[in-house]
Design a protein with these regions (language model features):
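Conserved AMP-binding/adenylate-forming
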Residues: 48, 74, 89-134, 455
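AMP-binding/adenylate-forming catalytic core of the ANL superfamily
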Residues: 151, 289, 299, 405, ...
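Conserved ATP/PPi-binding loop(s) of AMP-dependent carboxylate-activating enzymes
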Residues: 376-380, 391-422, 454-456
Length: 510
């Protein structure tokens, strides 16, 4: 089974150009700009390219005083992000960082995270997004394996950085005390006063390197560069066509920015000149309060955060919400329905992976009509579903999912790669295209078990158990079984104050 939305979307320059223009107009990207500011935007892109450096500099030229990001401590404009990032870039250059190097960023969501990312981009260096959950040895392995030249970290990680980063140059992104030490971003910016260095173009565009453990448990760097202008426009417009983001909106960024989904929404914010409202740690009550305080139209989150938002008592005014965009893990069908019943039909669930990027989106209509679906394959994406011999399966049949687009990764920095069929890479899942044209993901290709001669996927049982009112969370795994060959075991977390028994749960899934 092949779904080729790349050919259908971009067949012919006129058709593709009209589609881009229509969506760009709808989201507000074609609003008039003063000629002098338009020239400044063009100069920024020519100097920095279509990188984080270029996009923030262009936004600063267009609307310097617009709010770019708000965290616990401060509100920072686009012009100030541009200025601070130039100061930090100069400090990194003094520490030996240059084009083609890699700088690790070990930080939680904050304005300093964005300043650091843009500063690294201004040097033409790669940004390596380190997981804030890393233990010291994991961090050390990644820094050595990815040939990192410097590290920027929140000072809460000072102990493991000092123990495992060796003699690497380092700067501190967020300092918990808030006293701006000299080797922190805040301290370096304060020492510079109102000035900012005039930096040369690096001549190369750095990459985003996102760490993924896949099925091995060992972090691997998935590198993604800047696609060419046409392919980049097609991919961006396809996503904007599926999820109704608006230019100049306000997004509460709850998802961690060091993961692909959080970084993706940060990038959307760059493109659309959105205000990003974020906090270093997720708290469901705070997220809903921020929607009311800022009149936010979007929340970017992961599914488990939706469950916690549903558990919040009280009712902040969330009437401005138009989008709750989710990715990062499977969305339980019952959770989708309950969330929309409370907050309205605002839920958009995106399916993809760190390596492949975006594959499909299930919007509110999809989730109401077919709650288990991963949605429609995005325009600009090609999907093949194949059997064990790499032959395309018939529509409706389950097979291994391969996908690709201009946003797919270049390969792992180690030189390894995913299993491929031509230009398409394996997602590691099995699924099918239904009669309704929607994609359905049945589970991981290595999760399926054969129990009593039947193919069974843990996700099916997880979805069923999520429908029990006493169940907060569940994980299902396969184990060896003398009678059936293999069987499934469910590990269940009950809600506080509930008392469902094993027999109750067994009866629920029958």
């Amino acid at each position: 089974m092949v779904v080729d939305r790349l050919t259908s979307f971009a067949s012919g320059a006129v058709r593709g150009g009209l589609a881009v223009a229509q969506v760009a107009h709808r989201v507000g990207l074609t609003t008039p700009v003063r000629p002098d500011r338009l020239l400044g935007m063009g100069a920024a892109i020519r100097h920095w390219g279509r990188t984080p450096a270029g996009l923030y500099a262009a936004n600063a030229a267009r609307d310097p005083n617009a709010l770019a990001v708000s965290d616990e401590r401060e509100q920072v404009t686009f012009a100030e992000i541009d200025r601070r990032s130039s100061i930090v870039a100069a400090a990194l250059a003094e520490r030996g960082v240059g084009p083609g190097d890699a700088v690790a960023l070990l930080a939680r969501n904050s304005a300093a995270f964005i300043v650091a990312m843009v500063a690294i981009s201004k040097l033409g260096a790669d940004v390596l997004y380190a997981n804030t959950g890393f233990a010291g040895p994991q961090l050390g392995d990644v820094l050595a394996g990815e040939n990192v030249s410097a590290i920027i970290a929140d000072d809460e990680f000072a102990e493991i950085v000092d123990a495992h980063a060796g003699s690497l140059p380092r700067l501190w992104a967020w300092d918990d005390a808030g006293d701006a030490p000299a080797d922190s971003i805040a301290g370096i910016v304060a020492a510079a006063g109102d000035s900012a260095p005039d930096l040369p173009s690096p001549g190369v565009e750095g990459r985003h390197v996102i760490l993924t453990s896949g099925t091995t448990g060992k972090p691997k760097g998935a590198a993604r560069g800047t696609p060419n202008a046409l392919h980049g426009a097609v991919s961006a417009i396809a996503l904007l066509h599926a999820i109704p983001y608006r230019a100049g909106g306000v997004t509460v960024l709850a998802a961690p920015a060091f993961h692909a989904w959080g970084l993706g929404n940060l990038t959307i914010g760059m493109i659309l000149r959105s205000t990003l409202v974020t906090r270093r740690r997720f708290d469901p009550s705070t997220v809903l309060d921020l929607v009311e305080e800022y009149g936010a139209d979007t929340i970017a989150a992961v599914p488990v955060m939706c469950q916690r938002m549903l558990d919040v008592e009280g009712s902040p005014d969330t009437s401005t919400l138009r989008i709750v965009a989710l990715s990062g893990s499977a969305l339980a069908p019952t959770l989708a329905t309950r969330f929309m019943d409370r907050f309205g039909d605002v839920l958009y669930s995106l399916y993809g992976s760190t390596e492949i990027a975006y594959v499909s989106v299930a919007g509110p209509t999809d989730l109401r009509e077919a709650p288990t679906t991963a949605g429609k394959v995005l325009q600009g994406v090609t999907v093949r579903i194949v059997d064990e011999d790499d032959a395309d399966v018939e529509p409706g049949e389950v097979g291994r999912i391969f996908a690709g687009s201009s946003m797919s990764f270049e390969g792992y920095t180690s030189g390894e790669d995913k299993a491929r069929l031509g230009t398409l890479a394996s997602i590691g899942d099995v699924g099918r295209i239904g009669e309704d044209g929607r994609l359905y993901v049945e589970g991981r290709d290595d999760d399926m078990i054969v129990s009593g001669g039947e193919n069974v996927f843990p996700a099916e049982v997880e979805d069923a158990l999520h429908g029990h009112p006493d169940v907060l969370d569940v994980a299902v795994i396969g184990v060896e079984d003398e009678k059936f060959g293999q069987a499934l075991v469910a590990h269940v977390v009950l809600r506080d104050g509930t008392s469902a028994t094993t027999d109750d749960l067994r009866a629920h899934v029958k």
